[in-house]
């Protein structure tokens, strides 16, 4: 692995480049096609994928679904606002990030909706452990009382631009058209947001699931990337995918989450359904075993996602590509445009 200095992942993206809503229709998003042999970049749109990829290429898709994991409550004792983000459920307790103006203490009751409460149990390694009262599943309670977990930079950009969209609209925008897995992610596999049913039907595809956690947005705080404490996420690969994977001619991972799932697979490949937790950190120097190309969005500076893309391109070329994307007016981050990294024989 390359001993990458985190400062090499620094760059400045103008606020005007941050997308606050997706392209409509989904496949009208712009697409920067990057041959990995160093030849010239092409500027296309996502709906051109059938003309860009080989007819026998295989897309690897993350079928996870996004929970409406953000919620707004009030302290039962004072009425003060407490905002939360659901992370996971373990034995009836929820791990949540909580943001409040005052001090939070065990036993505090939060009023949520329609007589539903959350009671603080104890601090967690990150955030708090809370208990829903009455008890209920995260899927059911958050569907009724939660909101789309948009990244903070989108919410900030909307506020700065005085933009407002109904949560029902974001619930549609921030969900893939093909996702039929467990609703357990607190962020979308955003490269997949560009795909339409018509596009997906034109390719062979393989199914994986990775439950995207809040750690995906966590900036690298260490001086060396290798020292970053990588977040853990749950992933699942069904037997059918494991059987078909070695026979695929070129495997194009749609999104960093699909790619991390593939590269986390043990060797030799399991012969039955495989589930595990992965904390794989992919950086320059990584030797890819199961991904020949990658469809991805334009990522935040100082992020592990950016380091993953640099594992394909090298950090210097990636910085040049991002500079070109800014100059060409590409839209960045979760609701933004896409980049397609391909072997040089893609044409």
Give a label for each model feature:
Residues 1-347:
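Surface-exposed, charge/polar-rich loops and edge strands
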